[in-house]
C-alpha cells in the first residue's frame, strides 16, 4: 500500500502531494517554485502574508519565501536549455514576450514543446512497448497509460505559467499531456508506415488504435509536419481539448499559450512563406483540434468501459 505523503509543507493542501524539490508539496506549489526561480516579487504587506490552499489568491513573494523556508531546494530543479535548430535562419521579428502571464519569448515557448515532443517521440522509437498502436488488451492499455504518468507530470510542472493553476487544473493538464504523449505521438510515428487493417477485427481497444491511425494519423501523414510544426500542434491541442471544466485562470493561460505558439509559428515561417501561405498553413494545423478532441472523448469512454483510470 502506498504511504500518504502528507500535506504540502508550503500551503498545507492534502491534494496530490508527493516529493518535489526535496520536500512534500502539492503540484501547484512545486510548479510555482520551478517557474519562479529567476523572478523577483514584491509584497505590499512586508512579507507577512499567510499561505493556505483554500485562498483564492496568493501573494507571490510570500509564497516563494515559504517554499524556500519549507525546504525546497533550487539545486533540485531540472536545468533545461532551449537551443535553436542548427542552421536555422534568424527570424525577422524581434523576440516578443507572449503575455503578462508568460515572460518567455515566442521562440522559448515553442522550443519547450519541441523538446517535450522530441523526448516523447524518442521513447516511442526506442521501445515498441511505448507505441500505443501495439496495445490490444485492457492490461496493456493500463500499462501504457501508467507509463506516461511521470513524464506527463514533469512536463506540466516545467510548463510555462502553470504555477498560477490550482491542483484541479493541473490534474486536468496532466491528462491532456498524457493523451498526447501516449496516443497522438504514437500516431505521429506510426503515420510514417502503412495502416494495420488487422486492428479492425480486434476488440474495442484495437478498433480505437485503428481509428486514431485512419483519422489523425492519416492527417499527420498528409500534412507532413516537421518537428517544429508538430510540437506546435501538440501544444495547441493540449491547451484546447476542453473536455473537463477548468478555472478562468486556466482558460486565460490557454489563450496565452495559443497566442504564443501561433506567434512562434509565424516567426518560423516568415523567412520563406508569404503571409497568405502562413495563414493557410497555421489553419491546417489548428483544424486538427476537433479531430483530436473527439479522439480524447472516445479514449475516456474506452477507459470507462474497461474500468481503467486515466
Swiss-Prot record:
Q: Which family does it belong to?
A: Belongs to the nuclear hormone receptor family.
Q: What is the lineage of its organism?
A: Eukaryota, Metazoa, Ecdysozoa, Nematoda, Chromadorea
Q: Which gene encodes it?
A: nhr-89
A Pfam family matched by this chain, by name?
zf-C4
Q: Which residues bind DNA?
A: 5-79
**Under which name does UniProt file this protein?**
Nuclear hormone receptor family member nhr-89
Could you tell me the superkingdom of the organism this chain comes from?
A: Eukaryota
**UniProt xrefs under PANTHER family:** NR LBD DOMAIN-CONTAINING PROTEIN-RELATED, NUCLEAR HORMONE RECEPTOR FAMILY-RELATED
Matching entries from SUPFAM superfamilies are given as: Glucocorticoid receptor-like (DNA-binding domain), Nuclear receptor ligand-binding domain
Q: Please give the InterPro entries that the UniProt record associates with this protein.
A: NHR-like_dom_sf, Nucl_hrmn_rcpt_lig-bd, Znf_hrmn_rcpt, Znf_NHR/GATA
Give a yes or no for keyword Transcription regulation in this entry: yes
Q: Where are the zinc fingers (NR C4-type)?
A: 8-29, 43-67
Domain spans labelled NR LBD? 101-310
**According to its UniProt record, where is this protein located?**
Nucleus
TM helices/strands, residue ranges: none
Q: What broad class describes the main subcellular location of this protein?
A: nucleus
Query: Which molecular-function annotation in GO is an example for this chain?
Result: sequence-specific DNA binding
Job description of the protein: Orphan nuclear receptor.
Task: Kindly indicate where the leader peptide sits in this chain.
Answer: none
Q: Which UniProt keywords apply?
A: DNA-binding, Metal-binding, Nucleus, Receptor, Transcription, Transcription regulation, Zinc, Zinc-finger
What GO cellular-component annotations does this UniProt entry give? nucleus
